Design a protein with these regions (language model features):
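Basic, Lys/Arg-enriched alpha-helical interface segments
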Residues: 1-65, 71-78, 85-95
C-alpha cells in the first residue's frame, strides 16, 4: 500500500518528542507499505488492534492513535492525524 503522506506522519511523530512513537510509526509504515490490503479483514490480520470508525481506520501506536483514510482500490492509506489518547477521546477528528 502507498501511504499519503509519509512526511506528515513522521513530522507528527517527531513533534511529540516521544522516541518510542517515532519507532512505532516507522514499524507501522514498514508493515503498511509491505502489504497489499484488499479489505478491512486483511488489514486486521496484520494490525490486530485496528478499528474501523466511520470511514477511517484507527491504529493503536501505544499511547497514540494513528487515523487514516483508506482506498483499497487505489491501494493507499491517507494520513489524517496522529493523536494522543486524550485528544482522540475528544472526538474532534471525526468531523
Amino acid at each position: 500500500m502507498n501511504v499519503i503522506s509519509k512526511p506528515n506522519l513522521f513530522d507528527s511523530a517527531r513533534a511529540t518528542g516521544n522516541p518510542q512513537l517515532l519507532e512505532r510509526a516507522a514499524r507501522w509504515y514498514e508493515l503498511a507499505t509491505k502489504n497489499d490490503f484488499g479489505n478491512f479483514v486483511e488489514v486486521q490480520n496484520v494490525f490486530p488492534t485496528v478499528d474501523w470508525v466511520s470511514d477511517r481506520l484507527v491504529f493503536n501506536l501505544g499511547s497514540y492513535r494513528l487515523i487514516c483514510g483508506v482506498s483499497y482500490r487505489r491501494k493507499a492509506f491517507f494520513f489524517k492525524a496522529l493523536l494522543s489518547h486524550a485528544a482522540y477521546d475528544q472526538g474532534g477528528w471525526k468531523k
